[in-house]
Regions:
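Aromatic-enriched hydrophobic runs in primary sequence
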Residues: 6, 26, 36-41, 80-81, ...
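Mid-chain, well-packed structural core segment of small domains
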Residues: 68-92
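Amphipathic alpha-helical binding modules
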Residues: 89-133
Length: 133
């Protein structure tokens, strides 16, 4: 029970920090805040900024607690999703594709339904198109 409360509190803190980052207008400031969020909530930005989906899944497999693993994957997907708005092509599509795959995994394996997650997945499909097939 304490583990679940901790994870939920961590997610709330992360979402609040993400909202504060989104209020920043300047792209460089947003990028720096995103880097800070990676390092604070998910893991080293130096790794996740260049990791393939296979690398990410291997890293996440090291987290034994499934709820914690899915929460981190969801946070990472959010970071990829929002970071895509701060970069150009082809990096944008790569980030969106990775975000989609993580959202899809969390959606399939998690026990929490999220309409917001589904909406983001639909938006990514529109933006990226055939790359997801």
């Amino acid at each position: 029970m304490l583990q679940r409360d901790y994870i939920q509190r961590l997610i709330r803190e992360f979402m609040a920090a993400l909202e504060r980052m989104l209020e920043k207008k300047e792209v460089e400031v947003r990028r720096e805040k995103i880097r800070e969020l990676y390092n604070q909530y998910v893991g080293p930005y130096a790794f996740y900024s260049i990791a393939t989906i296979e690398d990410v899944m291997k890293a996440m497999a090291g987290i034994a607690d499934e709820e914690k693993r899915l929460s981190k994957m969801d946070m990472l997907a959010e970071l990829y999703y929002h970071e895509a708005d701060t970069v150009g092509q082809p990096t944008r599509d790569e980030l969106l594709t990775t975000a989609f795959m993580l959202f899809d995994y969390v959606d399939a394996h998690g026990d929490t339904f999220s309409i917001e997650r589904r909406n983001k997945m639909a938006e990514i499909k529109q933006k990226v198109g055939d790359a997801l097939k």
